Amino acid sequence: MANVVVIGAQWGDEGKGKITDLLSRSADVVVRYQGGVNAGHTIVVKDKVLKLHLIPSGILYPDTICLIGSGTVIDPKIMLSELDMLVENQIDISRLQLASTAHVTMPYHRLLDQAMEQRRGNNRIGTTGRGIGPTYSDKSERIGIRVIDILNEDKLRTRLADPLRQKNNILEKIYAISPLDFEEIIKEYIEYGNRLAPHVVDCTRVIHQAARARKNILFEGAQGTLLDLDHGTYPYVTSSHPVSGGACIGAGVGPTLIDRVIGVAKAYTTRVGEGPFPTELEGSLNDHLCSRGKEFGTTTGRRRRCGWFDGVIGRYAVDVNGLDCLAITKLDVLDELEEIKVCVAYELNNERIDYFTSNVEDFSKCKPIFETLPGWQSSTSDCRSLEELPEKAMMYLKFLAELMEVPIAIVSIGPNRDQTIIVEDPIHGPKRALLAA
């Protein structure tokens, strides 16, 4: 039995969906512990591309229970559309369970998110505009609406009255936006609640029962380490905790329940939205990575910013999350390059530093110090073992393992399930006995 957390080791979009999908084969329960529809993951199964935002990747396995935990925020309209899409693809959704204590994104959250971002002008954060930040803000202010509230009309009326009055006041007086109708919201969200009711459970209790029965539990994070509210490039961050510690809070478990933490990182780096990005590329190289890697957001469709692999933020992710091993994705995107650079340190104020600075003003001044490695200039997409990889591709992976000071357990060389090299079973294999330098 092993309980595993999967996290993003960069700024999100690392390919966690594919890795979680693969690991879900060994999991009895998969738990999404934070975030909302601001995160998306793409899974390719038998030439079908499934784009999910809220539903855990494990839903594709017929014997896996999928939980959406208390640390998430739910947009019921989008969640129901995803469930409908899964049903259309003959996927059983009866195994999906939703925490009664998860908070719900309301119409005013989306309006406020978009209005506040527009008002920031040149200081915008790069929010998806899906209402995630305002939903978490109401949760902290203890005026939020939870899933359990939309299951009962009388309760929803009581819970919604004061918050809607406040939000309409802000929308009208500050942003000149027409107020929202109380009765329309009640009608809409009670309908959502009626449809979601069969899936609503005491999520924490379900997890504890699974743990006592010695089931394999997989905790699935959204976004990435550098987007964490406390440990990321604040204020250019999300409103929740994608780091491994967030799994304990968002799922309601103690840290001793976690056996392993697996970090997912691309073989290069990407970022969506605003904020400093030391290894960011421009021109033809940026275009090449974006085109080859299909670097457009699942949620917003925005083009991702692309850059070389950053070992400094990588080591930071190892430390913050307590990573046991890595999954390196999109190695194949680098196949055609003559040479590949890796950031091993920064230059800040004419001094070399090898650590991530949480001061965003200083971080924005950091200049990458690179080491250059030879490219392999041959296809890796058909490789199914380390021995089949080009020698220079192996050199690159070993360099990353040494730089990050953790072993590599999985290498992904394409979007399909079978385009994966399992170096060692990251769940049941020997700890820290995988691909290292």
UniProtKB/Swiss-Prot annotation:
Localized where? Plastid, Organellar chromatophore
Which pathway does the database say it acts in?
Purine metabolism; AMP biosynthesis via de novo pathway; AMP from IMP: step 1/2
Cite the binding residues for Mg(2+). D13, G40
Keyword line: GTP-binding, Ligase, Magnesium, Metal-binding, Nucleotide-binding, Organellar chromatophore, Plastid, Purine biosynthesis
**Could you tell me the Gene Ontology terms of the biological process aspect for this record?**
'de novo' AMP biosynthetic process; IMP metabolic process
Q: What Pfam families does this protein map onto?
A: Adenylsucc_synt (PF00709)
Q: Which residues bind IMP?
A: D13, E14, G15, K16, N38, A39, G40, H41, T128, R142, Q223, T238, R302
The residues listed in the UniProt record as binding GTP, with positions renumbered to this chain, are G12, D13, E14, G15, K16, G17, K18, G40, H41, T42, R304, K330, L331, D332
Instruction: Determine the domain of life of the protein's source.
Output: Eukaryota
The cofactor note from the UniProt entry for this protein is: Binds 1 Mg(2+) ion per subunit.
Q: Give the matching CDD domains.
A: AdSS
What class does this enzyme belong to in the EC scheme?
ligase
EC nos: 6.3.4.4
Q: Where does substrate bind?
A: T298, T299, T300, G301, R302, R303, R304
> From the record, what ranges are coiled-coil?
none
Q: Which Gene3D superfamilies match?
A: Adenylosuccinate Synthetase, subunit A, domain 1 (3.40.440.10), Adenylosuccinate Synthetase, subunit A, domain 2 (1.10.300.10), Adenylosuccinate Synthetase, subunit A, domain 3 (3.90.170.10)
What's the cofactor? Mg(2+)
Q: Which NCBIfam families does the UniProt entry name for this protein?
A: PRK01117.1 (NF002223), purA (TIGR00184)
**What quaternary arrangement does the UniProt entry report?**
Homodimer.
- State the family named in the UniProt similarity comment for this chain: Belongs to the adenylosuccinate synthetase family.
Which protein, by its recorded name, is this? Adenylosuccinate synthetase, organellar chromatophore
